[in-house]
Amino acid sequence: MSISSPSAASGHLVSVSAPAKINLHLEVLGLRSDGFHELAMVMQSIELADQLHFRNTADGTISLRCDDSSLSTAGDNLIVQAAHLLRERSGFSELGAAIELQKRIPIGAGLAGGSSDGAATLVGLNGLWNLNFSQGQLEGFAAELGSDMPFCLAGGSQLCFGRGERLESLQAMQASMAVVLVKDPSVSVSTPWAYGRCKELFRSRYLSQESDFEQRRQQLRESSWLNPLRADDPPPLHNDLQAVVAPEVFAVQTTLKLLSDLPGSLAVAMSGSGPSCFALFADVDSAQAALKRQQPAFDAAGLSSWCCAFRSEGIKLEA
């Protein structure tokens, strides 16, 4: 790595968007020796994004402000953790940043909003501080901070294995698909709870050998609907955590039922550990038309909804 003299001009502004993700496939294979679950997933970036702005500080402080007062801006926030990690790895202890977060991805929704914000911080401060870390190095830092963060940084369409940090890129789509995404704003689901409950219910089905894990990975790699993703052979959508969460979270049941009534939907599923759910469509126009038709029902149920195209790339500097 070659590091230039770090930037210290306090007026310089860098902006980065941090897109949400959905899980087109989430399979819990078994338990790893480190206690985490071994996963086989297909993750997809979508055009619902937080916005982050970064400025240098002359006194070396790192601070975070957010337009959503319910979100912690202290050291437990992945943005703050990512900033401190990057500064530590740079070797320049005098570096500081004032960070502003415009929160658009719902919190605790199974959309990796916090992980994406942390990944965006690595990209934004790498640019602001003129550090010149490579994409591979940034993905390594991201993996230290969270299982979803390497994907959030790389973005697009990816196979994700291990805890989710091992990425294999998929071919780019020729035409973007889209989703209608829906969440009950009053409900959140704890990811550790969801995986813990999965272990309680289904541990007897878990695979235990690496050879068995690899067999399932290869079966997913060879799925007919991959490479590239396409509307004429759409992903069947699968999420092992849906069988865990839906029976115990009524909002997920309601959301899936309303989504299943959307005209033109190709498939319906929960994302991640929930409670966000989505319906898949061949294109944005079809998704927008379906959302417009079903919007009164979503509103009556107190549900928030979005129409989001698939996003083909990861996190990039905007300025």
Curated annotation (Swiss-Prot):
Enzyme class (EC, first level): transferase
Annotated keywords: ATP-binding, Isoprene biosynthesis, Kinase, Nucleotide-binding, Transferase
EC numbers for this chain: 2.7.1.148
Sample GO molecular function, one term: 4-(cytidine 5'-diphospho)-2-C-methyl-D-erythritol kinase activity
GO BP: any one term: terpenoid biosynthetic process
InterPro entries attached to this UniProt entry: GHMP_kinase_C_dom (IPR013750), GHMP_kinase_C_sf (IPR036554), GHMP_kinase_N_dom (IPR006204), IspE (IPR004424), Ribosomal_Su5_D2-typ_SF (IPR020568), Ribsml_uS5_D2-typ_fold_subgr (IPR014721)
Catalysed reactions, as listed in the record: 4-CDP-2-C-methyl-D-erythritol + ATP = 4-CDP-2-C-methyl-D-erythritol 2-phosphate + ADP + H(+)
Positions annotated as active site in the UniProt record: 21, 148
UniProt: ATP binding residues: 106-116
Pathway it works in: Isoprenoid biosynthesis; isopentenyl diphosphate biosynthesis via DXP pathway; isopentenyl diphosphate from 1-deoxy-D-xylulose 5-phosphate: step 3/6
Role summary: Catalyzes the phosphorylation of the position 2 hydroxy group of 4-diphosphocytidyl-2C-methyl-D-erythritol.
NCBIfam families found in the cross-reference section: ispE (TIGR00154)
Family under the similarity heading: Belongs to the GHMP kinase family. IspE subfamily.
Listed PANTHER family: 4-DIPHOSPHOCYTIDYL-2-C-METHYL-D-ERYTHRITOL KINASE, CHLOROPLASTIC (PTHR43527:SF2)
Protein's name in the database: 4-diphosphocytidyl-2-C-methyl-D-erythritol kinase
Provenance organism: Prochlorococcus marinus (strain MIT 9303)
